[in-house]
C-alpha cells in the first residue's frame, strides 16, 4: 500500500513538473506538413522590392518553425516543400497541413477564369489549409473556403466556444477582451438591416503587425471566406469569425468536407498560446474527416445567395446611391493625395512605400461625377428600371415577393425569377417542386423535365425513373445555393 501511495505521489509531482515546465505528452497523430510560403508576402511588397534571397530565407525559417511546432506536439511528422508534394502522399498520414503550393497537375485556362488544379476531384484526405491556401488549392475542387478577403487581422470573434477545437486535447485559454467592432462589419450590418454592438469579445490569436512590417510586406495577412451559403450543405461548419475588412460573419475558421480552413496565417512562433492550441486542436479535429469528400461543390465563388437579399434591396435605395457617390469621391481623394505625396518624395529622391509606388504609376483617372438616383438604378439593372423607375418600395416588394422563385443569372451575380417555378407557386428550395415536376412529365408537359434538370444533376429519361430516384433518396436530400441552386443527396 505504502509503495502504491509513493507511486501516485511521484506521478502527481511529475505531472506538476510537466505543467510548470509547459511540457505535455504528444498526441498520437501522423501529420504531413507541406511548406513553401514565407513569413513575408510578395503581394504586399513594393514593385521591385522583393529580395529573392531574403524570400527564400523566410520560407526556410517558416518551414523550420512549423516543423518544430508540429514535432513537439504530434508523434509522427513529415515536412516537405510544396514542389515535392504529390496528392498520393497524403494517404499515408492522418492529416496534411498545407502551407505551401504544390506543382499543379493541370493548368487552368486563365482567359476563361479557370484556376490551376493542385488536388484531384477524388481527393478525400483530411487537410488543414493555412490562410489563402484554402483558395489556391481548393478552388478547382469547389471548396467553400474561398477568397472573400485577404484582410483577416489578429483577433478571432464569434467563436463557437463549445466546438472541439476550443476544448482539447490541447488546452485553450479562451480569455477574451472587449474590442471595437470593425467599421466594415458595422457598415455591412446596416446594409443588411441588422445592428451590431460597438464592441464585442475577441480572442487574440497573434500580436498585431507593426507599421514597419506592414509597410515592408514582412507580414502574413490571413484570409476569410464568404459566409453566403456556407452552411447550406451538411458537410460544412463555421467555427469562428475574425476581425477583418468584411462582414461580421466572414469565415475565419471553418470546415467543408475534408478541407479545414485555418484563416490565421501567422507563423506558429508568432501565435499566442491560445492561437497555437487552437491550430493544434484544428489539426486533430480535421483528422476525423479523413476519407470524406465534398458533397456540395461551390464552383462559382461569387455566386449570389438569397441570405444577402436584404443587401440587394438596400442597393435599390437612395441611401445606397448616396453612399456609393460619397465612397467614390473619398476614394478618389485618397488616390490623389497619395499620388501627390509619391511624386513629391520621388522628386526629392526619397524611398517610396509600397502603396506610394503603386499609386505613382497609376494612370490618370477621369474626375468623379455624382450619379443621380435614376442613372444609378438604370446602370445597375436596366430591365428592372424600365418597370419600377425610381420607386424604392417597388424594388423591395419585387424581391420580397419573388425571392422563393429566384435563381442566379448566367453569370451567377444577380438573382432573377425562374418563370417555370414561379408559375407553379412552389419555392425552388421546397422538395415538393420535384414531385410536381415529375407530375408535369407524366402529363407530357416539357416544363417538368426542364425543372428537374435545372435543379438536380440527374438526367433520367422517364418519369418513373425520376420518381424512383426521388423516393429512394428523399430523406437525405438537401438544397444548396452556394453549390449551384441544386437538390443534392447527402451521401
Descriptions of predicted regions:
Residues 1-9:
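Positively charged n-region of N-terminal signal peptides that target proteins for export
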Residues 9-18:
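Sec-dependent N-terminal signal peptides
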Residues 15, 292-305, 463-468, 481-485:
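Short, flexible loop/turn segments with low-complexity composition
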Residues 18-24:
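C-terminal segment of classical bacterial N-terminal signal peptides
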Residues 26-27, 231-404:
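Extracellular ligand-binding/catalytic regions of CAZymes and related secreted enzymes
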Residues 30-139, 426:
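Helical hinge/lid and interdomain linker segments adjacent to catalytic or ligand-binding clefts
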Residues 129-234:
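An acidic, glycine-rich "communication" segment
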Residues 153-161, 337-491:
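Long, helix-rich interaction regions
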Amino acid at each position: 500500500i505504502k509503495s502504491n501511495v509513493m507511486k501516485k505521489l511521484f506521478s502527481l509531482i511529475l505531472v506538476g513538473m510537466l505543467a510548470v515546465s509547459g511540457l505535455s505528452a504528444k498526441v498520437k497523430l501522423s501529420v504531413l506538413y507541406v511548406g513553401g510560403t514565407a513569413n513575408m508576402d510578395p503581394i504586399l511588397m513594393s514593385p521591385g522590392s522583393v529580395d529573392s534571397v531574403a524570400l527564400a530565407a523566410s520560407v526556410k525559417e517558416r518551414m523550420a518553425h512549423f516543423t518544430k511546432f508540429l514535432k513537439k506536439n504530434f508523434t509522427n511528422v513529415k515536412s516537405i516543400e510544396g514542389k515535392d508534394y504529390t496528392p498520393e502522399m497524403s494517404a499515408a498520414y492522418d492529416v496534411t497541413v498545407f502551407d505551401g503550393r504544390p506543382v499543379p497537375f493541370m493548368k487552368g485556362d486563365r482567359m476563361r477564369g479557370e484556376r490551376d488544379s493542385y488536388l484531384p476531384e477524388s481527393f478525400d484526405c483530411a487537410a488543414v489549409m493555412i490562410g489563402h491556401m484554402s483558395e489556391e488549392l481548393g478552388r478547382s475542387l469547389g471548396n467553400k473556403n474561398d477568397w472573400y478577403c485577404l484582410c483577416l487581422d489578429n483577433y478571432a470573434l464569434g467563436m463557437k466556444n463549445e466546438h472541439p477545437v476550443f476544448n482539447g486535447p490541447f488546452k485553450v485559454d479562451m480569455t477574451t477582451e472587449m474590442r471595437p467592432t470593425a467599421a466594415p462589419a458595422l457598415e455591412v450590418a446596416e446594409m443588411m438591416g441588422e445592428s451590431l454592438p460597438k464592441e464585442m469579445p475577441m480572442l487574440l490569436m497573434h500580436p498585431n503587425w507593426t507599421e514597419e512590417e506592414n509597410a515592408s510586406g514582412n507580414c502574413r495577412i490571413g484570409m476569410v471566406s464568404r459566409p453566403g451559403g456556407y452552411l447550406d450543405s451538411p458537410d460544412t461548419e463555421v467555427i469562428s469569425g475574425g476581425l477583418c475588412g468584411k462582414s461580421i460573419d466572414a469565415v475565419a475558421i471553418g470546415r467543408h468536407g475534408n478541407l479545414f480552413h485555418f484563416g490565421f496565417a501567422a507563423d506558429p512562433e508568432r501565435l499566442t498560446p491560445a492561437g497555437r492550441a487552437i491550430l493544434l486542436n484544428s489539426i486533430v479535429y480535421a483528422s476525423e474527416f479523413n476519407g470524406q469528400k465534398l458533397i456540395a461543390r461551390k464552383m462559382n465563388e461569387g455566386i449570389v445567395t438569397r441570405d444577402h437579399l436584404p443587401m440587394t434591396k438596400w442597393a435599390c435605395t437612395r441611401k445606397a446611391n448616396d453612399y456609393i457617390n460619397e465612397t467614390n469621391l473619398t476614394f478618389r481623394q485618397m488616390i490623389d493625395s497619395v499620388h501627390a505625396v509619391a511624386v513629391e518624395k520621388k522628386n526629392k529622391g526619397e524611398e517610396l512605400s509600397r502603396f506610394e509606388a503603386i499609386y505613382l504609376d497609376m494612370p490618370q483617372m477621369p474626375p468623379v461625377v455624382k450619379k443621380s438616383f435614376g442613372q444609378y438604378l438604370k446602370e445597375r439593372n436596366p430591365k428592372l428600371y424600365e418597370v419600377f423607375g425610381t420607386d424604392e418600395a417597388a424594388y423591395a416588394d419585387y424581391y420580397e415577393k419573388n425571392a422563393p422563385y429566384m435563381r442566379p443569372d448566367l453569370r451567377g451575380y444577380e438573382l432573377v425569377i425562374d418563370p417555370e417555378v414561379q408559375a407553379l407557386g412552389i419555392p425552388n428550395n421546397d422538395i415538393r417542386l420535384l414531385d410536381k415536376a415529375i407530375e408535369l412529365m407524366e402529363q407530357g408537359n416539357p416544363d417538368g423535365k426542364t425543372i428537374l434538370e435545372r435543379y438536380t444533376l440527374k438526367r433520367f429519361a422517364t418519369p418513373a425513373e425520376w420518381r424512383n430516384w426521388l423516393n429512394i433518396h428523399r430523406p437525405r436530400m438537401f438544397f444548396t445555393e452556394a453549390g449551384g441552386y441544386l437538390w443534392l443527396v447527402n451521401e
